């Protein structure tokens, strides 16, 4: 089990390491910027470890640090309204899609009910992002 957890931690950590080519935010932050909320996101991964009885895992979480207009936000759970949270979530999702480039001719984006819950401040930027950054997915 320890070996498996080490393999997972090593691979997953690369998604959050700023110097890694696998870093999520290399693709997600530019998308988030296009929403115009002036939010800078930093993600920190706390490595998984087994419980002492090896029946479960603990410390398996990702923490988000937020800056707004270059100022650190100490209580993001209070600061982030639904529109900002939606923009962050969509940016991470689309950043992961962009990061994992598909070398196949048919590129599909599954957005399902994403537009239903979006307010107008996010709908228009999202349409622009899809048009500019995911044009090859719209064929």
Regions found by a protein language model. Name each.
Residues 55-62:
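Short, flexible loop/turn motifs enriched in small residues
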Residues 63-93, 118:
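Conserved ABC ATPase signature
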Residues 80, 98-107:
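Short basic/glycine-enriched coil/helix segment immediately N-terminal to the Walker B
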């Amino acid at each position: 089990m320890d070996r498996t957890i080490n393999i997972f931690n090593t691979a997953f950590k690369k998604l959050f390491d700023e110097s890694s080519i696998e870093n999520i935010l290399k693709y997600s932050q530019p998308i988030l910027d296009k929403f115009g909320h002036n939010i800078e996101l930093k993600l920190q991964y706390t490595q998984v470890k087994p419980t002492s009885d090896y029946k479960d895992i603990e410390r398996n979480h990702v923490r988000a640090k937020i800056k707004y207009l270059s100022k650190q936000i100490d209580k993001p759970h209070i600061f982030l309204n639904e529109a900002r949270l939606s923009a962050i979530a969509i940016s991470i999702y689309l950043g992961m899609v962009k990061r994992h480039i598909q070398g196949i001719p048919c590129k599909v984006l599954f957005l399902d009910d994403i537009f239903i819950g979006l307010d107008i401040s996010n709908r228009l930027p999202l349409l622009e992002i899809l048009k500019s950054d995911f044009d090859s997915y719209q064929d």
